[in-house]
Amino acid sequence: MRLDKFIAQQLGVSRAIAGREIRGNRVTVDGDIIKNAAFKLLPEHAVAYDGNPLAQQHGPRYFMLNKPQGYVCSTDDPDHPTVLYFLDEPVAYKLHAAGRLDIDTTGLVLMTDDGQWSHRITSPRHHCEKTYLVTLESPVADDTAAQFAKGVQLHNEKDLTKPATLEVITPVQVRLTISEGRYHQVKRMFAAVGNRVVELHRERIGAITLDENLAPGEYRPLTEEEIASVG
């Protein structure tokens, strides 16, 4: 990779600005000042900007994050803080959420820069299951599990939801597993049966379960097994 392209990615600036920074003696490679923007960067090179090391990325990245309330899963939002705030990674802005959560929903978010991998999670063709812990305003009705297993009619939609599995934990707390990703689906499913979601927490995507050791706002890389499970 050209040095100016790497610096542009790392700093989130244009190639022209990156070239100006390089010519301004602010970039070193293996301790030597490099002023040639076209310098060919090799994987083993150690790059620094103003003395601060810049890590090269080799291959796609995959993380799980325990999302707290109050953050959006988009990478750029003028009105709300985004989940990128928690990711202390080089060029974190290149990461995206493979399946977003609403601002008030907590739990498992998968972050990656591998578009094909995330597509296998979000594409309706792949029927990737997601499990949610749901707290309800009113006690769950006895027939809700059966209704969800058959599919329910969401407001302003023609097709029934695909069969979903409901596990009752307490009268007002349930675990719901769905294989679709319609807009606000869990909240709308309970609205369709006359109830209301007051708290929503995602526990699982496919075979990947939220690490119980992650506090809200913490994240970790996915294991090779977790990465390979999507597909």
Curated annotation (Swiss-Prot):
Q: List, alphabetically, the InterPro entries matched.
A: PsdUridine_s_RsuA/RluB/E/F_cat, PsdUridine_synth_cat_dom_sf, PsdUridine_synth_RsuA/RluA, PsdUridine_synth_RsuA/RluB/E/F, PsdUridine_synth_RsuA/RluB_CS, RsuA_PseudoU_synthase, S4_RNA-bd, S4_RNA-bd_sf
Q: What is its EC number?
A: 5.4.99.19
GO cellular component terms listed in the entry, alphabetical order = cytosol
According to the record's subunit comment, the protein's assembly and interactions are:
Monomer.
Q: Name one GO biological process term.
A: enzyme-directed rRNA pseudouridine synthesis
Q: Does the keyword Phosphoprotein apply?
A: no
Q: What's a Gene Ontology MF term here?
A: 16S rRNA pseudouridine(516) synthase activity
Q: Which reaction does it catalyse?
A: uridine(516) in 16S rRNA = pseudouridine(516) in 16S rRNA
* Pfam families the record matches: PseudoU_synth_2, S4
Q: Which species expresses this protein natively? A: Salmonella typhimurium (strain LT2 / SGSC1412 / ATCC 700720)
Q: Which SUPFAM superfamilies match?
A: Alpha-L RNA-binding motif, Pseudouridine synthase
PANTHER family xref list: PSEUDOURIDINE SYNTHASE, PSEUDOURIDINE SYNTHASE FAMILY PROTEIN-RELATED
This one is known as Ribosomal small subunit pseudouridine synthase A
- Catalytic residues at 102
Query: Is rRNA processing set as a keyword in this record?
Result: yes
For this UniProt record, the keywords arranged alphabetically read as follows:
Isomerase, RNA-binding, rRNA processing
Which segments constitute the S4 RNA-binding domain?
1-68
Question: What is the enzyme's class at the highest EC level?
Answer: isomerase
Query: Which superkingdom heads the taxonomic lineage of this protein's source?
Result: Bacteria
Cross-referenced CDD domains, in alphabetical order? PseudoU_synth_RsuA (cd02553), S4 (cd00165)
The role this protein plays is:
Responsible for synthesis of pseudouridine from uracil-516 in 16S ribosomal RNA.
Q: Which family does it belong to?
A: Belongs to the pseudouridine synthase RsuA family.
